[in-house]
């Protein structure tokens, strides 16, 4: 039987979002993203959403207990009963232990943790090479998906500005910091799931189609 409850790990730029979308399309599983859950709860004005907003408004980290509560609410919904793809949580071993507890409470289990492994030099090239249209937010890449030589850059409007922009998050300085944070927080998490014998990895330094083919083979 195919794996139906899984987690994707990987550094920024590894392609987790792309692979999650492909899995969603083929398997019909919901992607459970902490960012999406937080935004939805705040918008809906749920008790946990309001509590999370109180921290976010101060620029503080939302406590683990609040995030775990939001994830538990999401995993308890009917569309997640047949499986899910967890993205963005946990980020630390403490959060992983909390996840184990809530899954036990829901009588569910995490069946597989897949690490999409990409060399750091390739991650930096992927992230720093992105360029965005400031009007429609379409994303190009100076190497992998170069824009037209001259405007209009986008097919859905003809009033593109003369230059695309690099988002602040995609500068070399910020990308390097994001990768440092990822290494510090995720390496203990990788060991945590290795000890549970749930971790497997795929080489993410290939085309999305090739990575997905190996991912599906691993999941059965």
From Swiss-Prot:
Its EC number is 2.7.4.3. One of its GO terms (molecular function) is ATP binding. It holds the Pfam family ADK. One of its GO terms (cellular component) is cytoplasm. Catalyzes the reversible transfer of the terminal phosphate group between ATP and AMP. Plays an important role in cellular energy homeostasis and in adenine nucleotide metabolism. NCBIfam families: adk, PRK00279.1-2, PRK00279.1-3, PRK14527.1. This is Adenylate kinase. The gene is adk.
């Amino acid at each position: 039987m195919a794996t139906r409850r899984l987690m994707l790990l990987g550094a920024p730029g590894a392609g987790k979002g792309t692979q999650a979308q492909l899995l969603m399309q083929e398997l019909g599983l919901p992607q459970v993203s902490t960012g999406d859950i937080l935004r939805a709860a705040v918008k809906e004005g749920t008790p946990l959403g309001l509590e999370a907003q109180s921290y976010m408004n101060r620029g503080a980290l939302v406590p683990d207990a609040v995030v775990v509560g939001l994830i538990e609410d999401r995993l308890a919904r009917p569309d997640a009963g047949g499986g899910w793809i967890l993205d963005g949580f946990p980020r630390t071993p403490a959060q992983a232990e909390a996840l184990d507890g809530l899954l036990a409470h829901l009588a569910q289990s995490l069946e597989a943790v897949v690490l999409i492994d990409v060399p750091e030099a390739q991650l930096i090239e992927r992230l720093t090479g992105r360029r965005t249209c400031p009007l429609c937010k379409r994303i190009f890449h100076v190497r992998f998906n170069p824009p037209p030589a001259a405007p209009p850059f986008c097919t859905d409007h003809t009033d593109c500005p003369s230059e695309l922009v690099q988002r602040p998050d995609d500068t070399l300085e910020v990308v390097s910091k994001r990768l440092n944070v990822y290494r510090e927080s995720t390496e203990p998490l990788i060991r945590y799931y290795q000890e549970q014998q749930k971790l497997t990895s795929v080489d993410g330094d290939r085309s999305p189609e090739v990575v997905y083919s190996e991912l599906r083979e691993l999941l059965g």
